[in-house]
Amino acid sequence: MLLLSSFITVAGLILFETVSSVDNAIINAEVLRTMQEKARRWFLLWGMLFAVFFIRGVLPWAIVWAVVPAIGPIDALTATFSSDPKVLQAIEQSSPVLLIGGGTFLVFLFFHWLFLEPKNYGLKIEHFFAAQGVWFYAVVSVLLTLIVWLALKRDPMMAFGAVIGSSAFFITHGFKQNAEEQERKLMDRGMSDISKILYLEVIDTTFSIDGVLGAFAFTLSVPLILLGNGIGAIVVRQITISNIENIKKYIYLKNGAMYSILGLGSIMVIDSFGVHIPEWVSPVVTFVILGYFFVKSKLAHKG
């Protein structure tokens, strides 16, 4: 049963990481076209290793260790497989802080897309919210106030976690907002390939935070996150190399990724307040939502 649960979790992580990184793959492909062959190969090899082992391995491990410093670096890596009751108790007591922070980040990310970002409209209601963009900051401010108010009743550290999650959103959003402008500059062949590689690494790191935080809705196991998100990152690199134009044809994949992010963020916030949600729920929610928008994209392409 544990093996089946781990398999479903990893499969969900791979799918979520792949689809949520499509925008990143498109930026990578556009910039790589302006680089020399040697620089492209360097980025696709060493950049991938950095993305897989550092961002999707070290970052979730560092987050778990920061949230539960008492268990130490080794137990932070293997905590979910540990039989030590002290380690399991420490994880259980501290996980709400991680869950509420990551959940707040993801919910903010969804509402920013819903209210402010240009999109292919996959659902009729998206037209309404796109016309109300001015309300984005009011909505997330009220939402954060509500989450913090409820969290303070349980644990002040949970409230602090929610604030950290919202701060992380606005910091990473600043990097993403600058990405399009910087991409236009980097398309100029006069800039060095080293500058372009450094830019791509920064952008990849920024985009990866969504996937890393979303992964905690599936599991707190760092090895499973590394495996699932790592394979997803490799798939994204392959898409960058050979299939980016085909992926662009699936116009509603981004919609699916964002609704999945809403689902995962909501699960994390609810779970942080002590409502037990089975581990299989996050993968199933991801499969169903992404499957729906994949089919919708397929039908739109044929039509």
Question: For each of these PLM feature ranges, what is it?
Answer:
Residues M1-G303:
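Multi-pass alpha-helical transmembrane bundle typical of ion/small-solute transporters
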